Amino acid sequence: MLQSLHVHNFALLEDAKVDFAPGFNVFTGETGAGKSILVDAFGVVLGARASADYVRTGADSFWVQAVFDISSVPNLKAYLEEQGIEAEDDLFLKRQVTAAGKSKATVNGVQVPLSTIKEISTLLVDIHGQHENQALLKAEAPRFLVDAFGGVGIATCLANYAAC
């Protein structure tokens, strides 16, 4: 579960920290209030493309840190240990980008390649945007969902059927 998001010198935000409560959280506000900036910052800390354009005017760099409670995500803890990263109940993801475009990613204080952050994010977060339900209208979507739900068991059954 996402516990907090801390954003420093990102776009128009000098310093902002959002603490999340367990359950459902909602960002609301008028146009221009900064909701999209927070969503963009969250994407960056999860491994999305980070442009130097996000560095706040007058700053040398920005950083974004997200803290997750991973006590109920044992497969993530196993992955972290495989990567040589100490796995505790709190997971700290941090991404820093300089005005020159240099990026640095850390997990629990250990510098990692961006690919590690992206892999971790797939085990933690599922982000859905506006109109993404349209993907369900594609012909292959229902089959993909059934295959994903069935997992390896479905693939084994299909292989056995094809062998007959």
What are these regions (language model features)?
Residues 4-145, 149-164:
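Gly/Lys-enriched N-terminal cap/neck module of very large, oligomeric protein machines
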